[in-house]
Design a protein with these regions (language model features):
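Signature of N-terminal electron-transfer/Fe-S-associated modules in redox systems
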Residues: 1-156
């Protein structure tokens, strides 16, 4: 089973997940709060309750992939892969939302924090895990100043 290492600040937690598990579901099951709002109230209240609950529309579950991007579901599916995904949903073999890649790309496109970091940012609700990876939850970004366009992350 794949191992996912979640990093939040100085905290690190490693969990084993079945292959194909949606990253957001794995984090929630492990007790990791992935939804983030820039202005938080009392222990993550806004992030916990005011989000799209895994449909890929709000962008609050954005994560930074620091290792293992090749083991995550792709951002783009071929027509055949999309058709197979739809058939599997109809048969109850796959969960809707596991690979809504157009929605993921659109949501990340709207977010300032992903500008210049497109290769590292993913929405945890839109990513299926197929191998070991390291994920930074609620990554901090310099959204102003002279270092805005720097790319210090390993996937670039």
């Amino acid at each position: 089973m794949p191992k996912v290492v979640f990093i939040r600040g100085k905290d690190k937690q490693e969990v084993e997940v079945p292959e194909g598990t949606v990253l957001r579901d794995a984090a929630i099951k492990a007790g990791i709060q992935v939804n983030y709002f820039p202005v938080e109230l009392g222990n993550g209240f806004l992030g916990r309750y005011l989000n799209c609950h895994g449909f890929g529309h709000c962008g609050t579950c954005k994560v930074l992939v620091t290792k293992g991007m090749e083991y995550l579901s792709p951002k783009k599916l071929s027509a055949e892969e999309w058709q197979k995904h739809r058939e599997n949903i109809d048969k109850g073999l796959e969960k809707p939302g596991a690979q809504r890649t157009f929605t993921e790309k659109l949501t990340l496109w709207r977010m300032f924090s992903s500008i210049g970091h497109e290769g590292e940012m993913r929405l945890s609700c839109q990513v299926a895990v197929h191998g070991d990876c390291t994920i930074e939850v609620n990554p901090s970004f310099n959204l102003d100043g002279e270092n805005f366009w720097q790319k210090p992350y390993p996937n670039k």
